Amino acid sequence: MSYPPARYEGEHGEVSATYRPADHEPEVTYPSGNTVHYLATSASTDGLFGMYRWEFGPKPSGPSAHFHRSISESFYILSGTVRIYNGERWIDTVPGDFVHVPAGGIHAFRNESGEPASMLLHFSPGAPREGYFEGLAAGLGGLSDEERAEFYLRHDNHWL
């Protein structure tokens, strides 16, 4: 395996790093109390990846089993206990645990512990997941079945 083609051709490098302080307010807050922090978006990484900090409140929550056709999704647990479904069984993950789900891989995640929990979500390649997170937070209750199906399809979420 070799390195990918060069993405920067300059001779001396450039100042281009980004910084986001830990105490930055979340971009999305769900009615459940869960929050999403946009650490790196597809737009800010030139489509390479997206990275988000997901913070669960103590109420049970999380999506049911699904898969993505165009993106992989990885989970790195920061705090608490997060249940992750790997397509065969539920795994109780704890801080430091890592789960990678390739494109097409069946997965789900939930916090059922009654305590707050947090994790990093990494999507590769980058995709506009912000629209998905924000659409869910706004609520899909007013959408017809066809509109809801189109929303999920547009955001590469395929439910089982």
Predicted feature residues:
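Glycine- and acidic-residue-biased ligand/ion/polar-headgroup-sensing regions
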Residues: S70-V82, G87
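Short acidic-glycine-tyrosine-enriched beta hairpin
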Residues: P21, E88-I106
